[in-house]
Amino acid sequence: DEVLTSLLNLCTPLEPFDMPLLDAHGATLSEDIYAGERLVMKSGSRIRSTQIGLAASIGLDHLPTRPHPRVVVISAGPDLVEPGLNLTGDEEYETNSWLLTTAVRETGAVAYRVHSIPENEDQLKDAIEDQLVRADLVIISGERHDDSFDLITRTLKQLGEITEVEIAIDSSGRHNFGTIGPDKVPVVTLPGDPIAAYISFELLVRPMIRTMLGASTIHRPSVKARLEKGLSSTSGVRSYIRGVLSEDGKSVTPLGSQDEQATLSDANAFIAVPEGDADVAAGAEVTVVVLERRYI
């Protein structure tokens, strides 16, 4: 919670401006909209097709919006290889920039994936500095085994003020955050492991982007559900177990093989297990973070 608070302190809603109706689709409304004296759209809501139609029906051709934040996503490390190429030795396919770029877009921001993979400090510094002109937020991650985390941290400390943090989440990996460049652009380093990176994105980075959007809610919705199958987690830290929430939202089933990346694509929810609950029995009521809105 302290880390999230620090991250949110780096973010402020972007300055609003009027956008043509079609361009406003997917943005966040920055003012209440009235038809005469009747409130028809609330500030902070996401502008969807139905809001576009409503605006047109009351004679509006523009809407006051918060712009989409521009988020730059970079992966760095000498062992990373682009998908489609052959692997040798200790190399691994670069996964996180693809995962995180699309996750950023799903959150409502504009995402820029840096196509080159920096292998040393000079290359990474050049890549970051080249991107700052179009960045409201920078996300960086490294290799699955996190050996490149030190490379990333050293480079970022040349560019700004960086804080390294440990997060009390099971298998969370290494993180840092801060501001870089003359405009003090927020930056977050996520773990190299794709599962850990995605969980951290959902819990930490998504709320940052939603704050920049000026959204009325910055967190995923959560519900209480009955656990269909017992589970075990690491005592002393929070765990977010990938699971499948039932269509009616009343029960949730944890997926097997939690160390496999396939659980990310198979899950529609995280089962949030508090620090003190190492084992949770079937039938217990648990808190479920809903990842797909159609399930609530």
Where are these predicted regions, by residue range?
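Short, glycine/charged-enriched hinge/interface segments at domain edges or termini
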Residues: D1-P118, P254, F270, T287-I296
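Short, conserved clusters of charged catalytic residues that mark active-site
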Residues: T50, Q123, S222
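Helix-rich terminal scaffold detector
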Residues: D1, T65-L190, P194-I199
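Flexible glycine/proline-rich
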Residues: F17, L21-L22, G26, E31, ...
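Structured N-terminal alpha/beta-domain signature
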Residues: E31-R38, I74, G142-E143, D147, ...
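A generic local secondary-structure boundary/capping motif
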Residues: G36, S43, G59-T65, I128-E129, ...
